[in-house]
């Protein structure tokens, strides 16, 4: 029951992160600002998540999982409630900042707890279950939320999201009663020393290469696949839905193999697979069937590294695991911003169909870094028992 509640929580977080994008025109009209000004709500969230994630993770990691996770969900619920009643853009921005504070803590602490409570040899599957909530949020939650905003309005939709988040916080708090923090005894200096290690830095380097590559293409997907969609939004929606379904498959495969010896190479398979997908994209993006194949391949490989990266950081960082995962989340948001910027600069110099080749180069850099990491991070074999 606990892993399922954690997955429901990450589903709501995943929905909350992206659903606001579909509401920007309505929010702008309601608050008497332009759509571009309303878009600052996305910027505030991203910056808040990236900055507050590691900062808040340090004090919250000393608390019990019950306190940390409940506080995170309450912050998300309150932030959405503030947005739902906001009469001005600054008030709505304050609400999104509160949502960012809570969201930045829920996912890393949920991941850490899922791994800690899992039976021996099943921590990877538990992590993948939690991560599946994020994938489902983008595949199902975001389209549903956008539809609800069109039918009922953006304020009732955010209010409903706030109520749903608060409703999950209640059984989660009850289910985690008596679950103590795993690392309350260590001194802060000892607990966070692992974050300075070269292996942790290499893991984060792989993440940022991969994320910059993905968001360089994802941000401009409508332009890259214009030949396949002929400018029709419905066709683009199908391509993005296919990407999301591929993500579900990739996350499932990660969960199935993460606890096996072959799980060491999941991230390598992921970034290498993305390299292939991006290299093939210029040839496939001109037709709708070809674009569909490219998006499914990208979705499968692109979502295959998320849970294994968290799994590896929790192992390498030890007591500072939640902080390391939070730092990884911050790197993702920084990489997303850099990817969008890099993609825009590239499109100013070259045709859109060649943008995936830039992403392929970045993914190839992730492959090189991952190969170096695998050579340095070799699992230790248990010492043989004395005769």
Where are each of the predicted segments found?
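Juxtamembrane intracellular "pre-TM" segments in multi-pass secondary transporters
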Residues: 175-206
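C-terminal transmembrane helical hairpin of 12-TM major facilitator-type secondary transporters
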Residues: 264-308
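Helix-loop-helix hairpin linking two adjacent transmembrane segments in secondary transporters
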Residues: 89-91, 119-177
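Cytoplasmic helix-loop-helix junction between adjacent transmembrane helices
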Residues: 95-134
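Helix-to-loop junctions at the C-terminal end of transmembrane segments
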Residues: 52-65, 250-263, 347
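Conserved MFS/SLC helix-loop-helix module at the cytosolic interface between two early adjacent transmembrane helices
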Residues: 51-87
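Helix-breaking motifs and short loop linkers at transmembrane-helix boundaries and internal kinks
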Residues: 30-32, 64, 85-91, 284-285
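Paired small-residue
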Residues: 79, 90-98, 289-297
